[in-house]
Amino acid sequence: MPYVTRGWRAGLTAAAAATLAVGVLTAAAAAPASTGQPGTGQSGTGRSSTARAGIADTHPAWATASARTSSQPVTSGTVSARVYLAGQDPAGLASYATAVSTPGNALYGHYLTTGQVMARYGPTQVQVSAVSSWLTGAGLSVTAVKDEIGGYVAVQGSVRAAARAFGVTFGTFRGPDRRADRAPEQTASAPAGVASAVLTVTGLDTATHDMTPADTLPPPGPNYWVAPPCSTYYGQKIAVREPSAYGAKQPWTNCGYTPHQIRGAYHVAQSGMTGKGVTVAIVDAYASPTMLSDANQYAKVTGDQPFAAGQYTQDLASTFTDAAADECDAPGWYGEQTLDVEAVHGMAPDANVVYVGAASCTDQDLGDALALIVDNHLASIVSDSWGEPADLTSELPVYEEIFQAGAAEGIGFFFSSGDSGYENPSEDPGSDMQQTDFPAESPYVTSVGGTSLAIGRSNNYEFETSWGSVLDPLAANHRSWRSTPPGQWPAGYDGSGGGGVSYDFAQPSYQQGVVPNRLATALPNGSTSPTPMRVEPDVSAVADPSTGILVGQTTLQPNGTTYAFSLSRIGGTSVSVQIFAGIEADAQQAAGHPLGFANPVIYERYGTSAFHDVTNHPFGSRKLAEVRSNYTNPDTKTGPLVTYLRTLGIDGEGTAALPAVKGYDDATGVGSPAWYIQSFQ
């Protein structure tokens, strides 16, 4: 159960799904051996009660022979696992989620209530009883049961009991965190008479730290102070004393855009929409102790309206776990929450915002937070700025069920595409291969990529390029840049928006005719898929930290002892997804009804004035660059300033490149918002 990373990652693996118009998993779960009633011991195929069926993706990809650290089997210890329930009609749920979200379909906009979703597609008491009986019969103890969307039977017991229950042996392997981890040596299985009730199983490996009972949350961390000089709008200040690049003096980076500036650039202000009547849910881990006061102070400082009484609410886990710096790092998530809330409120100042704080940053806890929203229909828009490389966990089918149930209810999920490009190991040391991020790669969520945005003096849109930059430091003599611009890659790589082609999902119907086949069949490992696959992102918005947004938060001051409200400039697709989610709230207000899962509607507007078509080279052969200064110690505003040239529009190199070209591309999707809100008026 890996930890999810803020701002760009959260992954899970593949499991069973029926072939759908929207998308399918390419690594489907083993078909149940029985077509009889789960738990009755009856088999529609005539198999005996000892027959078993495999449960896909329960053998971690990293548990290979070459990664084995001991030849001895693991026979002692404790296993805490969740057996997720498949519900009554997984294929029917996926089909309805597609139909209700697709303009022109007879079911478009005919959303179900939470009760209707549960009655049609949720787990049954027969399934709960059958699964519980199987597990307790093997010697495991049931510790919790959830019988809603994302339902499960949680169990605990000895390794020997788990081995009996799931038909595996356990070994010791070098895990993704480079330590010795326990993992099953085979794919787990279930008795044939129960298998149709099982969606997936998690918790059989120990790829992360164990949960602690209830951590006390630490105080906020230090601020990241923006060094001078910087500009309030693009091109305000030119770096006249620094070396030229590409035949010209380059502008200083901006100090951090305000929501007012971004609303102007993306034509939010011109629409007159404010998100009134719409509720946006934001999911992160933990909860900042100063969130509401910080958001209201930030609104005042930037010239916007604070939250009205009751406009911002929180739904928090009863206890928090894994908060330490070497686990989830709770103070870092405070900053994530602050950015997310302030950005959504900045784009949709009249929308209601509900913050759902997960118990930790594990896939399991964040998934529980998402399920809470669907089970209680807390919002019609859900914005999430986290993820991880797609190969790291076994909970992908659980998330897919949650997203599909949400779509059936008219809930749209938005995820950041990532801050490490194509997750090439040279771009992201935490990824062991080039790949996309999950949940952003899911065909049932809107993946939001990143751009570098230039906003003019009058809050006007100047230009945009895909977010991806290479740094070139100032030479020691201050007369030139250390290397010939743009500098060295990957040594100078400074982050970029995520995207690429999924290994896990086939091309959804809404991408057909928009995403070029040559792109959709080009797998990350260089091979060619026989059929088109899901490509992300779907849309994009400002994410470059050097053209980022101002954020205000109570932080530890440079003296190391006091806390005070401070401003900083923040970027990443954590920004872009919240910007777009806020704009989606405005679009929903304009439409007068929930838009639900937005991708079919978004792709319907491809090539229109709803979107800016973002490319790497908006001015042809002219290269784009900025000059940026950083404090040597930005937490304390100390040390000499370090100056860099940042060349823009370089989202990876070689096989890791995500070029932004005319039309759809896997760096910026169909583009960034232009007259998107107005297209619904």
Each language-model region and where it sits:
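Ser/Thr- and Asn-enriched, surface-exposed coil loops between beta-strands
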Residues: 149-151
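Acidic, glycine-rich loop-and-strand cores that form catalytic or ligand-binding grooves
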Residues: 487-516, 605-632
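An often Trp-containing, charged/polar helix-loop segment at the C-terminal end
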Residues: 588-666
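Compositionally biased, intrinsically disordered low-complexity segments enriched
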Residues: 34-50
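Walker A/P-loop NTP-binding active-site region of P-loop NTPases
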Residues: 583
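Polar, glycine-rich mid-to-C-terminal structural blocks
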Residues: 441-502
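Secretory targeting and sorting signals
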Residues: 1-36
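Substrate-binding/charge-relay-adjacent region of secreted/lumenal peptidase catalytic domains
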Residues: 47-145, 154, 159-447, 494-571, ...
